[in-house]
Amino acid sequence: MADPRLNELLKWSIEQSEATKNDPDAPPAKTQLTPELMAALMGGPSDADLMKASMEIITSDNAEEVSLDDKLVAFDNFEQLIENLDNANNIANLSLWTPLLDQLKHEEREMRKMAAWCVGTAVQNNEKTQERLLAVGGVPMLVDLATKEDEPVDVRRKAVYALSSAVRNYQPAMDLFADELTKKGHKTDKVDATSMEAVDEVVNGLREKIGKA
């Protein structure tokens, strides 16, 4: 089946050609040159396409065709894509938050670690994605991962990194973080999310406990 983007690109090209040939001052073509069409024009998939393709590999249950190494490479690609603010915001538009957070419960430690890393990247200095993480229930999942004593240290540290990014300058997430820590036996009073010193005290305290594990 033909790629619909290519059909749209062809329409745009024809309209442009006809318009300029008949009247150099003609209005723009009716078919809009969207980012998707630009991606087709440039001969490659859009970042959104790459994000979706990466997540399809990450969540694949076809062990014969997709190895753990394949999944980790896809995770690395996904993490690099969402370093871009627009791509991080697009996680919600592409409905990728739920499958991403599901990987925090994966049986493979490296998958859990990469999932936490990607969450941390996505929410760093980004209130929009911090809000989404809170809305989809990601904070309690990360606290659970960070405080689980039988969890490998490197995975727990990535969970703390994600939490550190999730709560800075975003009070609702900081409040829930403190509540969840208290539930886990790490009593934490209310913390001002805009005070980096206060946030660091909580985060570093958790890191120290992990270091002693």
Swiss-Prot record:
Disulfide bonds: none
Secretion signal span: none
Pfam families (UniProt xref): Fes1
One of the record's GO cellular component terms: endoplasmic reticulum
One Gene Ontology term of the molecular function aspect: adenyl-nucleotide exchange factor activity
SUPFAM superfamilies tied to this protein: ARM repeat
Stretches forming ARM repeats: 22-63, 85-124, 127-168
BP GO terms, sorted: regulation of translation
Keywords of this entry: Cytoplasm, Repeat, Translation regulation
Localization of this protein: Cytoplasm
Function field: Functions as a nucleotide exchange factor (NEF) for Hsp70 chaperones which accelerates the release of ADP. Required for fully efficient Hsp70-mediated folding of proteins.
Family: Belongs to the FES1 family.
Name of the molecule in the record: Hsp70 nucleotide exchange factor FES1
Species, as recorded: Gibberella zeae (strain ATCC MYA-4620 / CBS 123657 / FGSC 9075 / NRRL 31084 / PH-1)
The encoding gene: FES1
